[in-house]
Curated annotation (Swiss-Prot):
This is Bifunctional nuclease 1. Bifunctional nuclease with both RNase and DNase activities. Involved in basal defense response. Participates in abscisic acid-derived callose deposition following infection by a necrotrophic pathogen. The keyword Nucleus applies. It comes from Arabidopsis thaliana (Mouse-ear cress). Its EC number is 3.1.-.-.
C-alpha cells in the first residue's frame, strides 16, 4: 500500500569489488494480506505483486529502497477518493437476522417487523432455503433503497446493535480498543468500504489517515462485520461497491409487523392479553437466553457466554424445525 524508503545498513556484508554498481533484484512474492481478527478465506487464490529492490553498495554498506506501487488492483491507499463513483454511500439498518424459506427472503428487524425481499438482479435466481442467521444489513443511500444483507457471527451483530442503541458495556470491546489505538498512534479513521465478494465471503477495507495530513493514508483488509462495527463507533461513512449493491442487493416488497391471530371478539378488548393461554412464549424464551448471554459478556464470563450462545443456536434450530414440520 505504502512506499517505504529507508536505508538498511549491513556492515557484516563485504562487497567483493569496491564501488560496485547498483544491482536490481526482482522477485514476485505473495501479496501481503492482513489477517486482522482472523480474516481467512478458503478457496481464494493469493495474488502476486512484483517488487523491485535496488541495492547500492557504498562504503561497505547496503542501502535498500523498497517500492510497491499498487495493492494489486491498481489503486493505492494514498490516492483513495471518498467520492469515488464506483462506490455508493450506505447506512446500517437495525436488522437482527435474515432467513430464506417458503415465504421468500425475510429480514427480521429489531422492532419486530418482517421485511420480505426479492433480488434486485433478475438473474439472481432462487435463493436456497436456510434457517435464520445473524446479519448486518446495509441500506444504499442513492435513492434505490436496496439492502445488502451480510451474514455474520452472533457476537459482532449483538455488539453492533449495542453501539447503535447506545447500550453501555462495562468493559471495552475490541472495537473500542482499536479506536483508541488508532487515536493514540496519531491517525484517524476516515472510511470503510465493502469492496468485493469472493464466492460467499464479502471483503472490506478500513482507511486511516494521519491527523493533520490527510494525504498520508493507510488501509487494512477486514471482515465486513469488524469494519462496520468500527465505522459505527467512529461515525464515519460506509460505502459499498456499486456492482455488489446492484448485483447482490435486495428490494423490499412487503413490510409489516409480526401478527398473531386474534380471538373471536366477545365485546371485550385485549382478551388475549387478559387471559394467558397457558402455553410458553417462544419469543420470551429466546429473549431470556439472549439476555443471559449479553449479561455474561458484560461481566466477562466468556465461557458461560459461549454456553448461552450455543443454547441460543440450539433453541432457534428447534424452533425453526417445529415451524416447518
Amino acid at each position: 500500500m505504502r512506499s517505504v524508503q529507508a536505508p538498511v545498513v549491513c556492515p557484516a556484508i563485504r562487497p567483493r569489488q569496491v564501488g560496485a554498481c547498483a544491482s536490481l533484484v526482482n522477485y514476485t512474492g505473495l501479496k501481503p494480506r492482513s489477517q486482522f481478527w482472523g480474516n481467512r478465506t478458503k478457496g481464494v487464490k493469493s495474488q502476486g505483486t512484483t517488487t523491485t529492490i535496488t541495492l547500492r553498495l557504498c562504503n561497505k554498506s547496503i542501502k535498500c529502497v523498497f517500492s510497491s506501487h499498487s495493492d494489486g488492483n491498481g489503486s493505492t491507499a494514498e490516492n483513495f477518493n471518498e467520492n469515488d463513483e464506483e462506490y455508493v454511500n450506505s447506512s446500517v439498518v437495525e436488522a437482527v437476522e435474515v432467513k430464506s424459506g417458503a415465504d421468500g427472503f425475510m429480514v427480521k428487524m429489531r422492532d419486530g417487523r418482517q421485511l420480505r425481499c426479492v433480488h434486485n438482479n433478475p438473474q439472481g435466481g432462487h435463493l436456497p432455503d436456510y434457517a435464520p442467521h445473524p446479519a448486518i444489513v446495509l441500506k444504499m443511500e442513492d435513492g434505490t433503497g436496496l439492502l445488502l444483507p451480510i451474514i455474520v457471527l452472533e457476537m459482532p451483530s449483538v455488539l453492533l446493535m449495542a453501539a447503535m442503541t447506545n447500550v453501555q458495556i462495562a468493559r471495552p470491546t475490541m472495537y473500542q480498543v482499536v479506536k483508541e489505538m488508532v487515536d493514540k498512534m496519531g491517525y484517524e479513521v476516515r472510511l470503510v468500504r465493502v469492496t468485493k465478494r469472493v464466492h460467499e465471503a464479502y471483503f472490506a477495507q478500513l482507511f486511516l489517515s494521519k491527523v493533520g495530513n490527510a494525504s498520508e493514508c493507510v488501509s487494512f483488509d477486514l471482515r465486513p462485520s469488524d469494519a462496520i462495527n468500527i465505522a459505527v463507533r467512529c461515525k464515519i461513512p460506509i460505502q459499498v461497491n456499486k456492482y455488489l449493491a446492484y448485483s447482490d442487493g435486495m428490494r423490499v416488497i412487503e413490510s409489516g409487523k409480526i401478527s398473531t391471530p386474534a380471538p373471536a371478539s366477545d365485546g371485550l378488548l385485549f382478551t388475549e392479553q387478559d387471559r394467558p393461554n397457558g402455553q410458553a412464549c417462544l419469543d420470551t424464551k429466546e429473549f431470556n437466553i439472549l439476555s443471559k448471554m449479553m449479561q455474561a459478556v458484560d461481566e466477562e464470563r466468556y465461557d458461560e457466554a459461549a454456553e448461552w450462545r450455543d443454547k441460543l443456536g440450539q433453541f432457534r434450530a428447534k424452533r425453526n424445525l417445529r415451524k416447518y414440520t
